[in-house]
């Protein structure tokens, strides 16, 4: 054995230990559906994107059934700027008029969706890109948001334009794709009963998909480590009741609130557990599913 091979042995032993640790986790998830929401910001780093695609292929080859839902907010914003279309946000959601929804569909269901399919294909996976309009997979209704005016303390409804909320998921479309041993890559664009195209928040879309599929896990990849306490430290595990309490006491605020609402909805629809984790961490998905340490904040119906 050469000196270089001898020097490499400790690293090989570490990798072997990792594989041994991963085996029971792989067996636990065998043939189980895992829905992964892949955020727009996490896609900005090419190396991280390739790592993500590699992880997805490894999940599929390990016996899991990964379903990918992607966002694309930053990419949409850049395209709107290039086209001279002004972006407006109300209550954290993009106000979507007729011109904007065309751009949203073009960016999400077109360039981003096919880019992710290409990354997975490059790693040896078989992926298919779809959006909620394909096969009438996700029907949506116009979203409504009610806010309290801080001056009058009266409620008022916020008009978000062509922003939709999932109303019905046609599971048969997804079942057919999974039966064909393909990895679905889904853009959060849905259709109304009248044929209108709707822009759907990617977290909300992923929650609806996971609920319809009764997924084993829903992973929400974000730009933060998970749910943080008031001292900005990661909370490793929460129950649904804990989540509601932390929202009520102001620990969970801002953009994390709709993510928590998605988690609660998915769990109430039959998803076993949801994890909010940092998509910028290398191989975060594998760390969560295949190691004893996990990653991010695990949310389940009740405390273990």
UniProtKB/Swiss-Prot annotation:
* GO function terms (MF aspect): acetylglutamate kinase activity; ATP binding
Q: What InterPro entries does the record point to?
A: AceGlu_kinase-like_sf, AcgluKinase_fam, ArgB, Asp/Glu/Uridylate_kinase, Glu/AcGlu_kinase, NAGK-C
Q: In which pathway does it act?
A: Amino-acid biosynthesis; L-arginine biosynthesis; N(2)-acetyl-L-ornithine from L-glutamate: step 2/4
- Kindly give the PANTHER family that the UniProt entry links to this protein: N-ACETYLGLUTAMATE SYNTHASE, N-ACETYLGLUTAMATE SYNTHASE, MITOCHONDRIAL
Assigned EC number: 2.7.2.8
Q: What is this protein called?
A: Acetylglutamate kinase
Q: Which family is annotated?
A: Belongs to the acetylglutamate kinase family. ArgB subfamily.
């Amino acid at each position: 054995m050469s000196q270089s091979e001898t020097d490499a042995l400790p690293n090989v032993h570490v990798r072997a230990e990792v594989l041994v640790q991963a085996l029971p986790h792989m067996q636990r998830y065998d043939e189980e559906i895992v829905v992964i929401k892949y955020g727009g910001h996490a896609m900005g780093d090419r190396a991280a994107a390739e790592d993500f695609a590699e992880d997805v292929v490894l999940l599929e080859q390990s016996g899991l059934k990964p379903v990918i839902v992607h966002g694309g907010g930053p990419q949409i914003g850049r395209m709107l700027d290039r086209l001279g279309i002004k972006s407006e946000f109300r209550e954290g959601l993009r106000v979507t008029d007729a011109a904007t929804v065309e751009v949203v569909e073009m960016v999400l269901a077109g360039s981003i969706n096919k880019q992710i399919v290409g990354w997975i294909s490059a790693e040896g996976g078989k992926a298919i890109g779809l959006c909620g309009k394909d096969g009438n997979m996700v029907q949506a209704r116009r979203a409504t948001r009610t806010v309290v005016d801080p001056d009058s303390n009266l409620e008022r409804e916020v008009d978000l334009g062509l922003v939709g909320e999932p109303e019905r998921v046609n599971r048969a479309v997804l079942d057919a794709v999974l039966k064909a041993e393909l990895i679905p890559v889904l853009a959060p664009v849905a259709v109304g009963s009248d044929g209108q195209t709707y822009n759907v928040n990617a977290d909300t879309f992923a929650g609806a998909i996971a609920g319809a599929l009764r997924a084993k896990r829903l992973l929400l990849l974000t730009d933060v480590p998970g749910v943080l306490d008031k001292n900005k430290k990661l909370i490793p595990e929460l129950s649904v009741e804990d989540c509601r309490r932390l929202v009520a006491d102001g620990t969970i605020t801002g953009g994390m609130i709709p993510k928590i609402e998605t988690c609660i909805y998915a769990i109430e629809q039959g998803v076993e557990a949801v994890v909010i984790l940092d998509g910028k961490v290398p191989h975060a998905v594998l760390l969560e599913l295949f190691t004893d340490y996990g990653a991010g904040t695990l949310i389940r119906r009740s405390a273990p």
